[in-house]
Design a protein with these regions (language model features):
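Short, flexible loop segments at the rims of nucleotide/cofactor-binding pockets, characterized by
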Residues: 39-41, 64-67
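Nucleic-acid nuclease catalytic cores
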Residues: 65-70, 80-125
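Bacterial N-terminal signal peptides that target proteins for export
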Residues: 1-6
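Conserved catalytic cores of phosphodiester-cleaving nucleases, focusing on short active-site segments
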Residues: 54-65, 79
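Short, surface-exposed coil-to-beta transition loops
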Residues: 71-75
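Bacterial N-terminal signal peptides
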Residues: 7-16
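Active-site phosphate/pyrophosphate- and oxyanion-stabilizing loops and adjacent acidic/basic residues
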Residues: 32, 77, 106
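Acidic-basic catalytic patches of nuclease active cores, encompassing PD-(D/E)XK
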Residues: 16-57
Length: 125
């Protein structure tokens, strides 16, 4: 009985987590749009084996959903360091509520005088 209950609980948690992670489009959709717009190459393998979402002539850009802004800061700086290019973040805003994340990342970058350029894609536009 306990085994069945635990299995049901795990299944319910898994389904709930996957429903909460639902996105309007996958990250790759926005990467492709931005790569075309900025003449960049997608999924470029770095010397350390990680992959930068978009590399342009001047920037190494991390593309991420707005609620992952904190991870985007670190990743963009890592890619920038490895390629000796400017760091960039492209935040995907799926609703007007995501604007708060854009404001937060811009404020932190300004406060700490980080050299990261921030762009946003508003999925509803």
């Amino acid at each position: 009985m306990i085994k069945v209950t635990l299995t049901a609980l795990l299944l319910a948690l898994t389904l709930t987590a996957s429903l909460g992670a639902a996105r309007l489009n996958p990250e790759a959709h926005y990467q492709e749009i931005a790569a075309k717009k900025y003449s960049g190459q997608t999924e470029v393998t770095m010397p350390d084996g990680t992959r930068c979402d978009i590399v342009t002539e001047t920037h190494a850009i991390e593309v991420d959903f707005a609620d992952k802004w904190a991870e985007a800061i670190g990743q963009s700086l890592n890619y920038s360091f490895q390629l000796n290019k400017k760091a960039g973040i492209l935040l995907i805003l799926e609703s007007i509520k995501d604007e708060k994340h854009l404001i937060r990342v811009q404020s932190i970058i300004k406060h700490f005088k980080l050299t990261i350029d921030v762009l946003a894609i508003r999925a509803w536009e």
